[in-house]
Amino acid sequence: MSQPKRRKLESGGGGEGGEGTEEEDGGELEVAVPRPRRTRRERDQLYYQCYSDVSVHEEMIADRVRTDAYRLGILRNWAALRGKTVLDVGAGTGILSIFCAQAGARRVYAVEASDIWQQAREVVRLNGLEDRVHVLPGPVETVELPEQVDAIVSEWMGCGLLHESMLSSVLHARTKWLKEGGLLLPASAELFVAPISDQMLELRLSFWSQMKQLYGVDMSCLESFATRCLMGHSEIVVQGLSGEDVLARPQCFARLELARAGLEQELEAGVGGRFRFSCYGSAPMHGFAIWFQVTFPGGDSEKPVVLSTSPFHPVTHWKQALLYLNEPVQVEQDTDVSGEITLLPSQDHHRHLRVLLRYKVGDQEEKTKDFAMED
């Protein structure tokens, strides 16, 4: 005999200490109990566990834009790496460490906090590099190296650059282990923003207005409901766009130099900047997209290598981070869009991204929206 269906409701308001609500269905009651807030250590352990599975590493290495950029960025710096020591922060399966060894590094310390370090050690052994690539299990904040290093390599970027990123770990390693004037790969990051018209979202919003023609049932009243469901939230949406979705010339609103002193404090306070756009033409504006690029120094007389996640470039596994308005706003050619954007750590989870957006479209009043990246 099947159990009666029960529906659990979230505690009112979503805040701490809110009273749980209950609902009767089939004669049973169930009270929603707010989950206890995890400690920073517990959140870190859950974060590391995510990287113990092969799927996440498959997705990253299968991203040819990402992996080729790292390989080229490392190999172009062969003159600076030859005979030197390198620290790979968050080494994963060890592929970047092996690239460094192929570039001539004398010793590579591959530090990995998740259990995938065991597979990394096997990969290193399979490639006959165990004498030069040393896999060290544990967070870089606690691992001890036998020496200072000449270079640090890390693929630390997350969605929107800073969500679940390891940048704080890289900066810790830089301060503790990198020799003065040492090499950082990549060396800098830039954040971009642009207003967008999301063609996929527009199709979903207009879907309900097509039902009368398709099935003889007028369901157009659901379009406003769909708008509230799909846009009236505060979640950062990770989705790939094309250049055709971009409504104005993108602008860089923040630049991070990884060697810069005080960068840790800047990140805690929030990085961002103001923007002003003039729209290309007539379209429904659904919100803003943010993306990033990182740059590897070019080495001796070589061009720098740029890894871009722009919608005007081939798609990467990072895609773009979308910030939807509460409803579409019609813009025309030369419509002015202005405001300010700030990226900072979530108050609830130090690894999660929060985005504060203040914006004004045309003659409309200025509005604000506070976004977060969900688990």
Swiss-Prot record:
Keyword Repeat: no
Coiled coil segments of this chain: none
Segments of this protein annotated with the region Disordered: 1-36
InterPro entries to which the protein is assigned, alphabetical: Arg_MeTrfase (IPR025799), Methyltransf_25 (IPR041698), PRMT_dom (IPR055135), SAM-dependent_MTases_sf (IPR029063)
Main location: nucleus
Class of this enzyme: transferase
Post-translational modification: Automethylation enhances its stability.
Phosphothreonine modified-residue sites: T21
Claim: Transcription regulation is one of the keywords in the record: yes
Family, per entry: Belongs to the class I-like SAM-binding methyltransferase superfamily. Protein arginine N-methyltransferase family. PRMT6 subfamily.
Assembly information from the UniProt record: Interacts with (and methylates) HIV-1 Tat, Rev and Nucleocapsid protein p7 (NC). Interacts with EPB41L3 and NCOA1.
Name recorded for this polypeptide: Protein arginine N-methyltransferase 6
Gene it is expressed from: PRMT6
